[in-house]
């Protein structure tokens, strides 16, 4: 089966909205090429970034690439997608462009690797592609070896970075953790590296569960993490000290009450995948459910919210 790569150039302000929209349309992977990446003063360990070819990046704004299988990507699908993009209120139509190309199956399987290099995702965590050799800087650095596949994030998205920082801040080695929508398994691995002994990783997508298990093996923690298919927290009967969910805002909205009921007293709900425009509604829902909001962090139009269950 072949794949269609769509490439959308747009202004920075709408890139999170476009990413959300593409995921809602069922994209199997999203790549963001930001014109500002060529001007940032990165630290030495990001040295790979200087080898980037400026011709591969837009001169202005961002290029968002998404991948759809050829069976799904019909003419009607394409027209609806383009119209949905043009309906974005703050889209700069003068900058906007939409292109597409067909990618063969064997090329698609390796396309995403061009964008994935070792990088420091938070104070403690460094993400390392499984096919690259990386020298740990010091004993405090915690390396997560990752082979996410095209369908799952490489950990460089702002929502993942914010979740990793929240895990550093709020997760203790004595806690129990449930990771909802685990994807590549990166957040479960992070919890394990902090010494957490009881971790459960859920995903409604069985392929995600398989990929997560493979990454758990790469990080020598398959014995410590229970990875199973699961539809949010609807059927969860166990209690946990921390619930983590880095998924889309409308899905988070569905699970807030269940997250509260799944937590032990004083437990934390760490959640991201939320665009700026939707975070206030999420915060208000969390408060109504009984959460005390302990932190709200923003990064490039994305938001990470941490709530605490302060009473039973």
Swiss-Prot record:
Binding positions (S-adenosyl-L-methionine): 160, 181, 203, 246
Catalytic activity from the UniProt record: L-lysyl-[protein] + 3 S-adenosyl-L-methionine = N(6),N(6),N(6)-trimethyl-L-lysyl-[protein] + 3 S-adenosyl-L-homocysteine + 3 H(+)
ATP-binding recorded as keyword: no
Record flagged with keyword S-adenosyl-L-methionine: yes
GO MF annotations in UniProt: protein-lysine N-methyltransferase activity
EC number(s) on file: 2.1.1.-
Swiss-Prot/TrEMBL keywords: Cytoplasm, Methyltransferase, S-adenosyl-L-methionine, Transferase
Coiled coil feature spans: none
Main location: cytoplasm
Subcellular location per the Swiss-Prot or TrEMBL entry: Cytoplasm
Gene Ontology CC terms, in alphabetical order: cytoplasm
Family from the record: Belongs to the methyltransferase superfamily. PrmA family.
NCBIfam families: prmA
Name by which UniProt lists this protein: Ribosomal protein L11 methyltransferase
Species name: Staphylococcus saprophyticus subsp. saprophyticus (strain ATCC 15305 / DSM 20229 / NCIMB 8711 / NCTC 7292 / S-41)
Source taxonomy: Bacteria, Bacillati, Bacillota, Bacilli, Bacillales
């Amino acid at each position: 089966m072949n794949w269609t790569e769509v490439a959308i150039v747009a202004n920075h302000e709408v890139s999170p909205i476009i990413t959300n929209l593409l995921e809602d349309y069922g994209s199997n992977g999203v790549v963001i090429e930001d014109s500002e990446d060529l001007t940032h003063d990165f630290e030495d360990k990001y040295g790979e970034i200087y080898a980037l070819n400026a011709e591969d990046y837009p001169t202005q704004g961002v290029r968002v690439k998404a991948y759809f299988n050829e069976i799904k990507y019909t003419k009607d699908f394409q027209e609806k997608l383009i119209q949905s993009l043009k309906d974005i209120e703050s889209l700069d139509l003068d900058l906007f462009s939409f292109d597409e190309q067909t990618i063969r199956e064997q090329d698609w399987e390796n396309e995403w690797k061009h964008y994935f290099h070792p990088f420091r995702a938070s104070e403690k965590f460094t993400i390392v592609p499984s096919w690259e050799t990386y020298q740990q800087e010091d004993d405090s650095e915690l390396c997560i070896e990752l082979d996410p596949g095209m369908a799952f994030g490489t950990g460089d998205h702002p929502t993942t970075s914010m979740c990793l920082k929240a895990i550093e801040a709020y997760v203790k080695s004595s806690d129990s953790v449930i990771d909802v929508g685990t994807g590549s398994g990166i957040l479960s691995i992070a919890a394990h590296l902090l010494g957490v002994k009881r971790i459960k990783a859920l995903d409604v997508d069985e392929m995600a569960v398989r990929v997560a298990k493979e990454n758990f093996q790469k990080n020598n923690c398959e014995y410590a993490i229970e990875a199973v298919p699961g539809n949010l927290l609807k059927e969860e009967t166990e209690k946990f000290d921390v619930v983590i969910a880095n998924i889309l805002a409308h899905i988070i909205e569905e699970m807030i009450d269940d997250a509260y009921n799944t937590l032990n007293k004083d437990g934390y709900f760490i959640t991201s995948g939320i665009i700026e425009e939707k975070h206030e509604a999420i915060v208000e829902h969390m408060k109504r459910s009984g959460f005390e909001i302990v932190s709200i962090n923003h990064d490039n139009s994305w938001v990470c919210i941490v709530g605490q269950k302060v009473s039973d």
